[in-house]
Design a protein with these regions (language model features):
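Conserved RecA-like P-loop NTPase helicase motor core
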Residues: 97, 101-222
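Short loop/turn segments immediately following beta-strands, especially the blade-tip
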Residues: 92-95
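"Short basic amphipathic alpha-helical interaction patches in structured regions
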Residues: 4-9, 75, 86-90, 117-121, ...
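Short alpha-helical segments and helix-capping/turn motifs at coil-helix boundaries
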Residues: 56-60, 86-87, 137-139
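Conserved strand-helix element at the start of the C-terminal RecA-like helicase core
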Residues: 62-90
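Interdomain helical connector at the RecA1-RecA2 junction of SF1/SF2 helicase-like NTPases
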Residues: 1-71
Length: 222
């Protein structure tokens, strides 16, 4: 990221220690606040919104953005952060996030290269009646097409623009089904169109906590 966000270190914010199921964020309370914020449920902000009469379009609460978040990809700094996020999302008080099947596509347990893909496809299924969050720190960010992915959260520092764009392109492939009603083999229902690739077009439209970019495959970053 750039500009006013240069001083914010995503890798430090999402720093975690411990292995796999024991992994925890070093700034767990702050990450929890962030999880509450992106769904518009952070209590101190509610008072502010009431006073100002405005409410930013938080990703997991805004009706315009929710359709893009049924199947999302969260790009984190490292394996420990991926497992720490999975552990935090699974905690009892995070009831909202229990609606989502969380897949950790990171570390040795996820396998090498494309070996990490089958668990993702299995969790997504047909994509209609499931919700998923794929956590990764690099796996499945190149050479992979999962048509149901429609958003990516950039939760790490990226020095290379190529890495940013390669990851962003993971959520820009089209998603359609043929013969959706079973009575017309020539009919095709488009559920997600291919994005234009203009990654910065909408960055100014949604400011604040979530900077949104892209068209049919939005990119969220702090």
């Amino acid at each position: 990221s750039g500009g006013e966000f240069d001083e914010f270190d995503l890798n430090a914010f999402f720093e975690a220690t411990g292995g796999y199921k024991k992994s925890r964020f070093n700034h767990k309370s702050d990450v929890q606040k962030w999880l509450d914020i992106i769904r518009g449920q952070y209590a101190p902000k509610h008072t502010e919104f009431l006073k100002t009469g405005t409410r930013p379009p938080f990703p997991y609460s805004d009706a315009r953005l929710l359709p893009y978040l049924q199947h999302s990809f969260w790009f984190l700094p490292n394996v420990a952060a991926c497992y720490a996020m999975a552990n935090l999302l699974a905690e009892k008080h995070n009831v909202f996030w229990h609606e989502y099947r969380v897949i950790v596509a990171a570390g040795a347990e996820a396998g090498i290269g494309l070996d990490a893909l089958p668990p993702v496809r299995k969790a997504i299924g047909n994509g209609f009646d499931t919700k998923t969050i794929t956590l990764s720190c690099g796996k499945l960010t190149t050479g992979v097409t999962v048509s149901q992915w429609s958003s990516i959260l950039m939760l790490r520092n990226l020095k290379s623009p190529e890495t940013y764009f390669q990851a962003a392109f993971r959520v820009q492939s089209p998603w359609s089904i043929k013969n959706p009603n079973g009575d017309n083999p020539n009919e095709e229902e488009i559920l997600k169109r291919s994005a234009s690739g203009k990654i910065d077009d909408r960055r100014r439209e949604f400011g604040g906590v979530s900077a949104v970019a892209g068209t049919d495959g939005p990119v969220f970053s702090l």
